[in-house]
Structures are given as structure tokens and as C-alpha cells.
Amino acid sequence: MRDRRGSLGTCLAQVQQARGGDSNKLSYSLKKRMPMEGLWPADAPSWMNKPVVDGNSQSEALSLEMRKDPSGAGPWLHGGGPVLPYVKESVRRNPASAATRSTAVGLLPAPTECFAQVACSGVEALERDWLGGGARATDGHRGQCPKGEPRVSRLLCHQKLPEMGSFQDDPPNALPKGLGSELEPSCLHSVLSATLHACPEVLLNDETKRVFLDRLKPMFSKQTMEFKKMLKNTSDGLQITLGLLALQPFELANSLCHS
């Protein structure tokens, strides 16, 4: 996970091979379904191509949508609660369709415990060390989001990724450290791969896939210097960084599915 030359893409390929799958099948299938243009860094998997979208208004609307949660419950709940309720309901309604689509793009479902482990480890650590008033917290990061909002929505509010693609205040130091073995690489890869498996309605839909991928653009853009600096300076916490990135697409997909 600490090989900066291609850690994310390399590990995803290793997971595909370990499960008996073709490491090129995912990128090939998705390139056929999502032809897009643009340059992405070597660390980004080949299926995360940057879409050409003039989406300022879309981003603003989506940002507002992501902050709305009438139920008051986030996608990830502690104590054995539901993890992404939409996924379970979607599979229950049409299991054959979901299985067919996921097989078509060479994906395997992730166990529920993988979602829970990544979510709990990343979000709790970030709240404790950054938003919760710890040593790395700053005055500008406290009390800006209502307590009733979902955990990950609160993180997105503070990170301001839609506007700037990175953390404005102390990007490297704001990340929590010391999770170590709590966040296993296999769990992270399962979550990243399962984004496509769990939400085919979003990622294979011409309208929503562009919004979804456009929101990932700041996290992998070559032009986002602060984000590159953040990755460079957190080699000990690279799994944490990638884990937080995995959380954000899931909340976005969940929001789009309910919009």
C-alpha cells in the first residue's frame, strides 16, 4: 500500500487476481460503457477516467442534495446497524439484474463487514483527531455542520472537496494517523470495487455517471497540488487516506440513488 508509483491500481489488480478474476476485465468493460477523456495520475485505477463535464451547477445542486437526509441517519450505522440500506433493498428487489450487471463489469460483492470496518475506522478517526477538537483540530473546522447530518456528509462539508478538491487548512496534518492494521487493504479494495457492484443504476446511467465521476475528479486530478502534497506527506497513513476516499463515493452513490 505504500508504493506510491501505483498503489491503488496495483492493489486493486492484486485483489482481482487473488479472487480468480482478470485484472484487466474491469477497466476494459467500463471503458466500453463509459468513454471519457482526460488525464489522470498513474495511481488512479484506469476505470476512474475524468469526464468532460461543465458541472458547476450540477456540483452545487449535488452538494446540497448530499447534505439533505430527512431520516437523520447516515449510510453507515454502528452497533451492527444497516450499512447502505439502499444496496440491500436494491438487491432484494431485483437480485438477478444486479448480479448480471456486476458480472458484466467483472466485479464481486463486498462483505458487509468490509463496509463497516472501513467506515468506522476512517470516520471515527477523522472525527476524533480533526473534527472532534483533538490536537489536529482547528477552530475553523468545529461546529460548522449540524449534528443531525450524516457522519460522512459532515466530513464532506468540512473537507470542501466539491469546491477545491482538497483540504484548505493544513491538508497533510489534518489526516488522522495510527490506524495501522485496523483498516485492512483487502477491505479497502472490496469497498472500492463494490461501489460499481452495489450501485449500477448510478454508474451505468448516462446522466448520473458523469455527475458521480465528476465528483471524484478533484480527488485524483493532476492539477490538485494540495491533494498530491497530502498523499506525499502521509505515507504512514496512506491506507487511511484511501479509506476516506472510498467513503465519499459511497455516500455520493447513495445520495444519487435516492434523489
Curated annotation (Swiss-Prot):
Q: Which GO terms describe its molecular function?
A: STAT family protein binding
Which InterPro entries does this chain map to? FAM220A (IPR040355), SIPAR (IPR029155)
The alphabetized list of GO BP terms reads: negative regulation of transcription by RNA polymerase II
Domain of life assignment: Eukaryota
Q: Which UniProt keywords apply?
A: Cytoplasm, Cytoplasmic vesicle, Nucleus
Q: Does the keyword Transferase apply?
A: no
Function text: Promotes dephosphorylation of transcriptional activator STAT3 by interacting with both STAT3 and protein phosphatase PTPN2. This promotes interaction of PTPN2 with STAT3 and mediates STAT3 dephosphorylation by PTPN2, leading to negative regulation of STAT3 transcriptional activator activity. May be required for spermiogenesis or sperm function.
- Cited PANTHER family: PROTEIN FAM220A
Q: How would you summarize the oligomeric state and partners of this protein?
A: Interacts with transcriptional activator STAT3; the interaction occurs in both the nucleus and the cytoplasm, is enhanced by IL6 and promotes STAT3 dephosphorylation, leading to negative regulation of STAT3 transcriptional activator activity. Can interact with both unphosphorylated and phosphorylated STAT3 but interacts preferentially with phosphorylated STAT3 in the nucleus. Interacts with protein phosphatase PTPN2/TC45; this promotes interaction of PTPN2 with STAT3, leading to dephosphorylation of STAT3 by PTPN2.
UniProt protein name: Protein FAM220A
Query: Which species expresses this protein natively?
Result: Macaca fascicularis (Crab-eating macaque)
